[in-house]
């Protein structure tokens, strides 16, 4: 395996577990994801896809470019960056590229990455959370009858991203839920991942009218300076939801 180097703001999103790295590579193969390859300080770029993985020997095989001179520069490079940019960003680097002959033609071979970045972009992709067994966010708020005391407001999540969460709240709204209000010590128990301890800030409140049903609100919260540990938990849960969404879409196709 090759150990990759990442920039400082990507460190909290690094996947170290070999089984997770292998699973991510297999997902990229399964969904025929396009991978951008850059080298020569970004001067050379091409798009490829992963052909196969040999977990036993720790080898990953990718399609090679058609230009021989370009391929020579690629094979001579000692720092090549591989990025899947759409949806959840996947990134890793390799210092050793080899040209090989497979039964279907030429390919490039790299070592299975020891580390890779898996990053959900903040500005894209809110993933719906389970409806049958909703994920609950517990928010400490001032007690209505005794503001000096706190009570726990439990809200069901409807979606989540790396930037924040969406919750569904029945009318009437708790008076503490106003735009811009921040709450410390909020806990979300993400299934199969763990429990967060976050500061959440009310970002938006949208009234939802459904025929013959009481008025409800979608209350959106953003995370306020989450710790690396909390961001890691959120990122892993988002990745689980993305895989479930992809599997569902392919099953319905």
Swiss-Prot record:
<dbReference type="GO" id="GO:0071945">
    <property type="term" value="P:regulation of bacterial-type flagellum-dependent cell motility by regulation of motor speed"/>
</dbReference>
<keyword id="KW-0547">Nucleotide-binding</keyword>
<protein>
    <recommendedName>
        <fullName>Flagellar brake protein YcgR</fullName>
    </recommendedName>
</protein>
<comment type="subunit">
    <text>Monomer. Interacts with the flagellar basal bodies.</text>
</comment>
<dbReference type="InterPro" id="IPR023787">
    <property type="entry name" value="T3SS_YcgR"/>
</dbReference>
<dbReference type="InterPro" id="IPR009926">
    <property type="entry name" value="T3SS_YcgR_PilZN"/>
</dbReference>
<comment type="similarity">
    <text>Belongs to the YcgR family.</text>
</comment>
<comment type="function">
    <text>Acts as a flagellar brake, regulating swimming and swarming in a bis-(3'-5') cyclic diguanylic acid (c-di-GMP)-dependent manner. Binds 1 c-di-GMP dimer per subunit. Increasing levels of c-di-GMP lead to decreased motility.</text>
</comment>
<dbReference type="Pfam" id="PF07238">
    <property type="entry name" value="PilZ"/>
</dbReference>
<feature type="domain" description="PilZ">
    <location>
        <begin position="120"/>
        <end position="239"/>
    </location>
</feature>
<keyword id="KW-0975">Bacterial flagellum</keyword>
<keyword id="KW-0973">c-di-GMP</keyword>
<dbReference type="InterPro" id="IPR012349">
    <property type="entry name" value="Split_barrel_FMN-bd"/>
</dbReference>
<dbReference type="GO" id="GO:0071973">
    <property type="term" value="P:bacterial-type flagellum-dependent cell motility"/>
</dbReference>
<dbReference type="Pfam" id="PF07317">
    <property type="entry name" value="PilZN"/>
</dbReference>
<dbReference type="GO" id="GO:0035438">
    <property type="term" value="F:cyclic-di-GMP binding"/>
</dbReference>
<dbReference type="GO" id="GO:0009425">
    <property type="term" value="C:bacterial-type flagellum basal body"/>
</dbReference>
<dbReference type="InterPro" id="IPR009875">
    <property type="entry name" value="PilZ_domain"/>
</dbReference>
């Amino acid at each position: 395996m090759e150990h990759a180097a990442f920039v400082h703001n990507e460190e909290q999103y690094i996947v170290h577990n070999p089984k997770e790295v292998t699973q991510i590579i297999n997902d990229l193969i399964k969904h025929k994801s396009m991978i951008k390859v850059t080298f020569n300080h970004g001067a050379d770029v091409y798009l490829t896809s992963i052909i196969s993985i040999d977990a036993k020997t720790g080898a990953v095989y990718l399609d090679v470019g058609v230009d021989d001179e370009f391929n020579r520069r690629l094979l001579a490079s000692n720092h090549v960056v591989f990025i899947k940019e759409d949806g959840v960003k996947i990134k890793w680097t390799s210092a050793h590229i080899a040209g090989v002959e497979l039964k279907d033609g030429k390919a490039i071979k790299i070592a299975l990455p020891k580390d890779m970045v898996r990053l959900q972009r903040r500005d894209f992709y809110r993933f719906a959370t389970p409806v049958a067994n909703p994920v609950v966010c517990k928010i400490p708020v001032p007690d209505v009858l005794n503001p000096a005391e706190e009570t726990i407001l439990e809200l069901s999540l409807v979606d989540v991203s790396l930037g924040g969460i969406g919750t569904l709240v029945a009318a009437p709204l708790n008076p503490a839920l106003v735009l811009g209000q921040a709450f410390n010590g909020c806990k979300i128990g993400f299934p199969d991942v763990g429990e967060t301890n976050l500061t959440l800030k009310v970002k938006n409140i949208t009234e939802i009218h459904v025929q013959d049903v009481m008025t409800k609100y979608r209350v959106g919260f953003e995370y306020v300076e989450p710790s690396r540990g909390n961001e890691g938990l959120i990122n892993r849960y988002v990745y689980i939801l993305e895989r479930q969404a992809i599997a569902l879409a392919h099953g319905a196709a």
